[in-house]
A protein has these predicted regions:
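Acidic, mature catalytic/reactive cores of soluble proteins
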Residues: 2-483
Length: 483
């Protein structure tokens, strides 16, 4: 969300027009959200309390509810409203301020960031409590654009030192592994909690087991038929009708509190907290690790662009390659549990990689590798800037690059020592080491074109994107970003 909001700020700050048209319904929703943020902007000066949080969320929820119900009942009217682009930019900037305040509030003492929180709504309050640390939260904050390079480094270092890291695969779990409570250790009410409740003591004394019972070993347990707090409330309602009305009225809230202390249903997160495979306990979810890889690379790129301290840049590079070293293609089949170059969904704590092909990891890997070799598109022009490419990746001896061209024909390009080859839009790109950057384009008609600098013009780039077959090879002489 933050990243897209920043993109919108940049986009609408640069456009040449000064107003846009939106549907009347979207306009009213925008007004509702913007007025809520504007009226509560003062809350950003400190910590937002539970009462103010409820007020803000109620107003935001009402704006959304009115928009949704209006569309459901009447569909879009077709009416249009005009919004000044300057006002849109102000709205996006204000929403960014609230997002940034939220991110800052979720920083943990250990330098990591909370990912998912629990929300408890009261009559006039909304209370926030935190769950355990999660890899997804660190990826989110690293990808958001919120952190300065030195702050990104702090997160990456803290993550490596956290319980999320597993030396077994030199990689990162979705969340720290833990032992589940044994079945016989569940549904145990502490004696001190029983002593707090006159109702529970009265029921135990009377031998009434509809809500609570005392075992032969002296332990206290809720009735086994109660599967959630709603069923516990129904049991208390029945007790009201059977002579316990005064005690139920007195202790109902306390019983609900004790029930949650025993079962912690509010913290139930599905398979992540109750299974040992897939995205469960002790599992590495490889798509999230590759998202972490890409996020680390983007923060390295930002540090370079900002002209950050070389030591900081070097440490960010170390963090990136440390994450990269834990990904499958760097491993032996024995360690990975499968062919290392094949994409797999996850690796449970008790076995090798599982679910071949079931992953979005490939997408992040492709993006990260293109960034590694320095290929990007700037204003329509293919540009080569290998800011994190290591000199050690260039060949130490002659080899060849096999590929399929735009016509589907298999081709081979010879590579000499000191070169590196890959394809882009099915066109072979051959890097050679040099102090100054230059490009040579090979055309299908046998001609060549030399270019000073690191960019191919937009028209030629479009021919490459469209796979016209006009350009058959790209030679780039350059200096890699790292040794």
């Amino acid at each position: 969300t933050r990243r897209f909001q920043q993109y919108l700020v940049d986009l609408f700050s640069a456009v040449e027009f000064d107003q846009v048209e939106v549907s009347a319904e979207i306009y009213e929703l925008l007004i509702g959200i913007n007025s809520t943020f504007t009226d509560n902007k003062h809350l950003l000066n400190g910590k937002i309390n539970d009462v103010d949080r409820k007020k803000v969320l109620d107003r935001l929820g009402l704006a959304g509810e009115q928009f949704r119900s209006g569309i459901y009942k009447h569909a879009f009217s077709g009416d249009r409203a005009t919004v000044r682009t300057a006002d849109l930019v102000k709205f996006f900037q204000l929403s960014l301020a609230f997002i940034d305040h939220t991110i800052a509030a979720n920083r943990r003492e250990d330098g990591l960031y909370h990912a998912y929180n629990l929300m408890t709504a009261g009559e006039d309050t909304i209370e926030i409590t935190h769950l355990y640390e999660m890899l997804e939260g660190q990826v989110a904050v690293l990808s958001s654009g919120y952190l300065k390079p030195e702050e990104a480094l702090d997160v990456l270092v803290a993550l490596r030192q956290s319980a999320i890291y597993t030396a077994r695969q030199n990689s990162y779990l979705l969340y720290p592994d833990r032992e589940l409570t044994r079945f016989i250790d569940k549904n145990i009410i502490r004696e001190a909690d029983v002593e707090r409740s006159a109702l529970l003591k009265a029921l135990v004394s009377a031998g009434d087991r509809s809500l609570v019972e005392k075992s032969s070993e002296g332990g206290y347990h809720f009735n086994g038929s109660l599967n959630n707090v709603v069923s516990a409330k129904k049991a208390m309602q029945s007790l009201k009708e059977n002579g316990y009305a005064e005690l139920v009225d007195q202790d109902e809230s306390l019983i609900e509190e004790i029930f949650e202390l025993v079962f912690t249903h509010r913290q139930f997160t599905g398979r992540s907290g109750g299974m040992y495979a897939y995205e469960g306990l002790g599992s590495i979810y490889w798509h999230m690790v590759s998202k972490l890889l890409l996020a680390a690379l983007e923060n390295f790129q930002k540090a370079v662009a900002d002209g950050s301290d070389p030591v900081l840049i070097g440490r960010l590079a170390d963090c990136y390659f440390d994450i990269r070293a834990g990904i499958g293609f760097n491993k032996t089949p024995d360690n990975y549990g499968a062919f290392p170059t094949d994409p797999y969904s996850h690796t449970p704590g008790f076995a090798g990689a599982k679910q071949p092909g079931m992953t979005g990891q490939v997408k992040e890997e492709v993006i990260a590798r293109l960034l590694e070799v320095g290929v990007s598109v700037v204003k329509g022009s293919i540009t080569f800037n290998p800011f994190i490419l290591r000199k050690s990746e260039f060949l130490s001896q002659a080899d060849s690059l096999g590929y399929f061209d735009v016509n589907g024909d298999q081709q081979i390009v010879a590579l000499a020592a000191g070169q590196l080859g890959f394809t882009y839009c099915q066109v072979p790109v051959v890097y050679s080491l040099a102090e100054e950057t230059s490009i040579v384009l090979h055309y299908a008609d046998g001609t060549r074109k030399s270019i000073d600098g690191n960019s191919i013009d937009a028209d030629t780039s479009m021919q490459i994107f469209d796979k016209k077959g006009v350009v058959t090879q790209i030679e780039v002489a350059l200096k890699p970003g790292l040794e």
